[in-house]
């Protein structure tokens, strides 16, 4: 569960290392974001000599959470970290590589480009 002020790792090579959630996109009174939700975040830590800068406001989609994801078949998926992928206004990732495993539910949420770049889909 991701809420405002939560720090997340960045799971792509866009140039940012750490994000902080400042808003959850969707209904006006949503308290938590889960895997597949789009958030507004601010960049807290960057890689040197990359196009993104610190304190830049961006959109990101959550791809991993420490809170478990329950599937209809009874499988429970839980990760060791909270991670997101930076996207543009159309929903395409800004980076060209995705690091770490992601869940296949992102394909149903029309993030097929992120799923195709991922090295492992659970």
From Swiss-Prot:
Superkingdom of source: Eukaryota
SMART domains per record: Ribosomal_L14
- Annotated NCBIfam families: rplN_bact
Instruction: State any single GO MF term.
Output: large ribosomal subunit rRNA binding
Give the main localization category.
Answer: plastid
Q: Does the keyword Coiled coil apply?
A: no
Q: What is this protein called?
A: Large ribosomal subunit protein uL14c
Q: Which GO terms describe its cellular component?
A: chloroplast; cytosolic large ribosomal subunit
Write the record's keywords in alphabetical order, separated by commas: Chloroplast, Plastid, Ribonucleoprotein, Ribosomal protein, RNA-binding, rRNA-binding
Question: Which purpose does this protein serve, as stated in its record?
Answer: Binds to 23S rRNA.
Q: Which CDD domains match?
A: Ribosomal_uL14 (cd00337)
> Could you give the subunit structure recorded for this chain?
Part of the 50S ribosomal subunit.
Which biological process annotations from GO are given for this protein?
translation
Gene coding for it: rpl14
Q: Which family does it belong to?
A: Belongs to the universal ribosomal protein uL14 family.
């Amino acid at each position: 569960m991701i809420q405002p002020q939560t720090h997340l790792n960045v799971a792509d090579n866009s140039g940012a290392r750490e994000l902080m959630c400042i808003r959850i996109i969707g209904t006006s009174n949503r308290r938590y974001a889960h895997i597949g939700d789009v958030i507004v975040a601010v960049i807290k830590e960057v890689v040197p000599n990359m196009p993104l800068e610190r304190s830049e406001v961006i959109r990101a989609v959550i791809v991993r959470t420490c809170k478990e994801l329950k599937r209809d078949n009874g499988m429970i998926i839980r990760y060791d970290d909270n991670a997101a992928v930076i996207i543009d206004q159309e929903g395409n990732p800004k980076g060209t590589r995705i690091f770490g495993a992601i869940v296949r539910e992102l394909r149903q949420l029309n993030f097929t480009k992120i799923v195709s770049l991922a090295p492992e889909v659970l």
